[in-house]
Amino acid sequence: MLDVNFFDELRIGLATADDIRQWSHGEVKKPETINYRTLKPEKDGLFCEKIFGPTRDWECYCGKYKRVRFKGIICERCGVEVTRAKVRRERMGHIELAAPVTHIWYFKGVPSRLGYLLDLAPKDLEKVIYFAAYMITKVDAEARHRDLPTLEARMGVEKQQLEDKKNADVETRQKRLETDLAQLEAEGAKGDARRKVRESAEREMRQIRDRAQRKIDDLDRVFDRFKNMKVQDLEPDELLYRELRDRFGQYFDGGMGAEALQRRLADFDLAAEAESLRETIRSGKGQKKARALKRLKVVSAFLNTRNSPMGMVLDCVPVIPPDLRPMVQLDGGRFATSDLNDLYRRVINRNNRLKRLLDLGAPEIIVNNEKRMLQEAVDALFDNGRRGRPVTGPGNRPLKSLSDMLKGKQGRFRQNLLGKRVDYSGRSVIVVGPQLKLHQCGLPKQMALELFKPFVMKRLVDLNHAQNIKSAKRMVERARPVVWDVLEEVITEHPVLLNRAPTLHRLGIQAFEPQLVEGKAIQIHPLVCTAFNADFDGDQMAVHLPLSAEAQAEARILMLSSNNILSPASGRPLAMPSLDMVTGVFHLSTLAEGAVGEGRAFSSVAEAQMAFDAREIALQARISVRLRDTTPPSDWVPPADWVTGDVFTLETTFGRCLLNEALPEGYPFINAQLNKKAQAAIVNDLAERYPKIQVAATLDALKSAGFYWATRSGVTVAIEDVVAPPNKAEILDDYEQRADRVQKQFDRGFLSDEERRSELVQIWTEATNKIAEAMEKNFPQTNPVYVLVNSGAAGNMMQIRQLAGMRGLVSNPKGEIIPRPIKANFREGLTVLEYFISTHGARKGLADTALRTADSGYLTRRLVDVSQDVIVREEDCGTERGILTRIARRGADGVLVRDRYAETSAYARTLASDAVDEHGEIIVPAGTDAGDVAIGQIIEAGIESVRVRSALTCESRMGVCAQCYGRSLATGKLVDVGEAVGIVAAQSIGEPGTQLTMRTFHSGGVAGDDITQGLPRVVELFEARSPKGKAPITEVSGRVKIEETEKTFKVVVVPDDGSEEIAYPVSRRSRLRVREGDRIEVGNQIVDGAVDPHEVLRILGPRQVQLHLVDQVQEVYRSQGVSIHDKHIEIIIRQMLKRVNVLESGETNLLPGELCERARFESENRRVVESGGQPASARPVLMGITKASLATESWLSAASFQETTRVLTDAAINARSDSLVGLKENVIIGKLIPAGTGISRYRNIRVEPTEEARAAMYSVGAYEDGGSVEYGAFGTGSGQAVPLDEFDYRSSGDFR
C-alpha cells in the first residue's frame, strides 16, 4: 500500500484505456460471481481469485499451496498468487469493451464538457451517442473541391438519364392509351368506359412523372448535402446517409455512437480551436462571447494538461476490487450482494452478446441496438439515473452506482473518509458527580476495565500475576480481585476524552482524569455541563482513550477541562456556577435583618465559626469581624492611619466570611449579596488575573460551598409559594372596561379593524405589565420562588408573571398577536379556550425548533467548509494596515465611557498603530495586546477609537498570521502558530445558531419572543444573497428631490458634479431616511431595510462591504444576547472575498471572466510585469460560503462538501493538483492534519532526554548491568511520556 507520508500533492486526471489496463490484474470475461454449491469464486468472473487474489490468506484456489512459506508463488494449476487475502481490497480488473462508450459524467454533466469541447448541443450529442443520428467525422475537402466539376457533370448525366427515361415511359404509356381508346371505339363502348380508361392512364403517367421527379429531387438533395458537408454535421435520416455513403463514401467518414465521437476527438485540433475562440472573445459580444469563454475554459484545460480528450470515451471499463463490492451469504442460504455487482453483470452480459453478434456478422441495425444497450449499461454503472429511468433492483429500488457511492452523507467521502468509527471507546448515560474536581470524571469500573484492557493485561504480566498475555486476558475476563488493583494503578494520570453529541464547538470534547466509580453511568463535573450543553435527563456521552504518549500529552495539556474554562467564541468563562450552586452562594452571601446574634463582634473568623457551631449566631446575621491577612473590599473606606496589610474590622455576615475562604489569597474581600451576574463577574475577574490552576481550584471551592449551602438553605417550591397579587381582579376590571370601549367604537365604525387590534394589544400589554408590577411588590424577599429568580439560579420574571400574574397576550401561528389576552395564570389554571389559544404559539415554537436545528447544523457545516484551511501559518505578516474600531463613546455628561461593543471588537486584538493622546504622547504602543487594562488606559487618556490588526487586512498568502488574529480567546494568550482559527470561527458562529433555534422553545410561545429573523438572516448574509425588498443605496453624492406618484415615491439624487440625475423608485410603504433637499453622500441608504452586499461592494469597495457584513451578522446575534467576537466573523468574510473576477487577461495565463484566488492573480501579474508584459485586470467578487467552498483550490475538500460528481469531473479535466494545505484533505487521505502539533514546524522537532531522564533510564532494572542505551529511540518504544517542558522551541532554526 502507498504510504501517505511520502507525497505532498495529489493530482486527479482523466484515465485513458492504457491506464485502466495498467491498473488491472486481468480481464473479467464472465458475469458469474460465486459458485453457489462450492461457495468459491468462478474463474474469469467478477470475484475471480486469479485476477483479484486469494480469498484466504496464503492459499491458492485449488489448494496446492497452503501456508505463508509459499509467499509470492503463482500456482501453475489455478494461476492464483499465494499472498494475503487483503489484496482483494486493492487489486482491480477490467472489462475490454467490444465497442467504445462515452463517460456519462463528461457528456451528461452540467455543463456538458464533451458538448463544450466539440461545440455540440447536448441534445445533438445524445442523438449521436445513442444511435439516433449519424455524425460526419471527417471530410476530404480538397478531393471534394478537385472532383466537384466531374461529380457535378456525372450528376447532370444521371439526371438527364432519369429525365429521358421518364419521357420514354410517358410516351410508351401515351401510345398504349391511344391504342386502347381506338379499340374501345371500334367495339362501340360508351363514353363512360372510355373516360375511365383515359383517367386511369393519366393517373399512371402522373405517377411516372412524380416518381422520376422525386428521384431527381433526391439526387439534388444528396448532392447539395455532399457539397455543403462539414465535419460534425448530424444526419438523422438513415436512407439519405446511406445514399451519401454509397455515392461519395471516399470523400468523408461518418458514424454513430461513441465510436464516431472517438474518431472526431482523435482528429480534434485543440490549439487551433483555442486560437479561434480567443479571436471570438476579442471581437465578439454578448451571448457569443460568453459561450466562447465557457468553451475556451474546457479547451484550454485539455491544452494545458497532459489529459487527452480521448479519455472521455472508454475502450475498457475498470472493475473495482471485489472486497469493495462484497457478496455475503445470508442465513437462508441466499446471497446479499452490492448493487455494483448487478451493474457490472449487465455490462459484461451485453458486452459478450455484442462480441458474439460482431463475430456472426449480424446486420448493422441489430449491432447498433446492442451497442446502444452497452452504452446504457455503462452509464448505469457510472451514474445510475443521470440519463433516463434508473436501473432498478428488487422492489423497484434504484441501484447504487459508482457515483452514488461517493455522493452525499452516506457516500465514501462523508461516511468513511471524514467520519470513521473509533476503537478504544464506549458510551453510557451521564449523571452528575458533585464530589469530583474540575479535571476529573467518574468512569464505571466495567467500562474502564474494557477500555484499559491491554494496559491492564501488560501490567499483570509485568507484576508476575500472570505468566503470559493469554492468561492475563483470562484473568481480566474473569474479573479477579487483583485485576481491580492493577486497573486503579493503570488509570492514574491517564486522561480520557469525553464527548457529547452534537459536538457544536471544540468544548464538546474535553479530557478528564478518570476516577473509578460503581454503577454503569459516567459521572461528570457540574461545571462542565455548560460547555457540553449537557443535562441529566438521559443524555449519553462517549468516552475515548488516547493511546500514544503524544496523544496523552496533548489531551492533558490542551484538552483538560480545567484548561478550557474560557469560551473560544467570546473569551469569557463558560464554567460558571449555575442552578443549585448559585442558590447556595446567594444564600451564603445574603444579609438577613434581625437574625440571631445580630450586632455581635468577633476577633477572628475562627471565633465566629465557634459561635455559629454553638448556634449563637445565624449564618446571615449582621456581625463585625476582625480580619487579618486579608485584602479589604474594593469599596471599603480605610481609617486615616491604616496601611495595607494591617488588621481591619468589617461589618459583614459569617456566611460571607465562609464564602471568601473559597476565593484565592489576595482577592479583595467580597462583602455583598451575590446573584448569578455578580458570581459570573467574579469568575471573569479570576480568569483574567489568576493562573488556570488557581481558577479551577476556586471554581471547585465555590461549587462545593454552593451545593453544601443550597442544601441547608431549604429553598423548595410549593404551590403556596406562587403568590398572586391580591388586587388582580380590580386591575383586570379596569382594563376590561377600556377594552369594551374600544370594541364599541369599532362596532359603531369609528375605528378600522387594524386600529382596533393595535389599541387592544396596547391595552392588554399595559394590563399585563401592571399586574406583573403588583405581583413583584407582593412577593416577600424570602419567598423561595422569588429567591430562585432573584439569585439568577433559574427562571425569570416573565415566567413568574405567567405563574402568579397573568399569562398575557399570545401569538397565533402566523406570528400575529391575538388581541384577546389569557387573563388566568398557571396557579389558577387556564380555561379551555385560553388553553387552546396558548397551544398555538407553543406548537409553533416546537415545530420551529425542529426545523431550524437542521438549518443551523447545515450552516455550521458550510462555515466549517469555507474556513477549514484558515490556520495561523506565521507569526507576523508584516502588514501596516488595520481597521479602525471605536472603544469608547461620550456620555451625556461628556465623559468617555467604554463602548458596549468594545468587548467583541477591539478587545483581545493587537494594536496596529500607537494609541496617541491629544498631546502626542504614546499611551499604548503598537503591537500591544488590547486587554481590559490597556483599553482602560486608552479610554482614560481620552482616546475614542484605535486602529487594530484584523484578519480582514492580513497579508499572509495562506491562512492568517498570529499578530493579525490577536489573542486566542480560549487561552488568553497570543494565538499559537498552527491554531486552526478557521474552524474555531465556524464553530463560534454555528454553535449559538443552534442555541438561537432552540431558545424559542423555552418561552412557551409567548408573543414577541420568537426569532424568525435570526437564523435565516445570518444565512442570507453569509451566502451573500440579495435580500428580499432590498433598500437601494446612492451611487453619487448630491441633493435629494422626492417626487410622488400614485403608487411609488421617486427619490431623485441631483449629483454635485452636475452629471445626470439618478432616480430610485421606492414603494410608498417604505420608511424614507431622507427628506427633500437633504445632502446625501455616496453609499447612503435611502429607505429603511436590508442592503444588497453586492451593491455595497460595487459602490463602496471591499473594505466597506466587509465591515457591513460583520456589523449585520453581529446585529442578529446581539439581538439574541449572544456574544461572539468580531474576529470570528471576519475570518469567514475574508474567505468570502478571497477571489477576483478577471476582466482583461493581459499577457497572463488567466482567462477573461475566470474566478481566481487573489494570491494567484497577484503572483501571475508579478511574473508578467517582471518580464515586461501586460498585467491582467480584475475586480473583487463577493461569494457566498457555499460557492466559496466549492471554488476552493483543493478539489478533495470541494468534492467532500457538495456536488461531488461535478467537482470531480471539473478537477479531472483540469488535472487539478491538491497541495493538501487544509484540514479536510489531510483527514481524507489519512495524514496528520497541518494544524496544532501536526504542522511541519512542530513535526520536525527532535526530543532529547534531559540529564534526569537519562539517569532515570539507567536506573531501570533492565539496564543495571550497564548495557548500552540507545538515546535516539528515547520515549518512543517504551510508551513513556516525554517531558517537553525543557525543550526550547524557539532556539531550533529549522521550523518551516
Swiss-Prot record:
Its EC number is 2.7.7.6. Mg(2+) binds at D535, D537, D539. It comes from the Bacteria. It is an enzyme of class 2 (transferase). GO terms for biological process: DNA-templated transcription. GO terms for cellular component: DNA-directed RNA polymerase complex. InterPro entries: DNA-dir_RpoC_beta_prime, DNA-dir_RpoC_beta_prime_bact, RNA_pol_asu, RNA_pol_N, RNA_pol_Rpb1_1, RNA_pol_Rpb1_3, RNA_pol_Rpb1_3_sf, RNA_pol_Rpb1_4. It catalyses: RNA(n) + a ribonucleoside 5'-triphosphate = RNA(n+1) + diphosphate. The keyword Magnesium applies. Keywords: DNA-directed RNA polymerase, Magnesium, Metal-binding, Nucleotidyltransferase, Transcription, Transferase, Zinc. Zn(2+) 2 binds at C877, C954, C961, C964. Binds 1 Mg(2+) ion per subunit. Zn(2+) 1 binds at C60, C62, C75, C78. The keyword Transcription applies. Its cofactor is Mg(2+); Zn(2+). Signal peptide: none annotated. The RNAP catalytic core consists of 2 alpha, 1 beta, 1 beta' and 1 omega subunit. When a sigma factor is associated with the core the holoenzyme is formed, which can initiate transcription. DNA-dependent RNA polymerase catalyzes the transcription of DNA into RNA using the four ribonucleoside triphosphates as substrates. Belongs to the RNA polymerase beta' chain family. PANTHER family: DNA-DIRECTED RNA POLYMERASE, DNA-DIRECTED RNA POLYMERASE SUBUNIT BETA. This is DNA-directed RNA polymerase subunit beta'. It comes from Frankia alni (strain DSM 45986 / CECT 9034 / ACN14a).
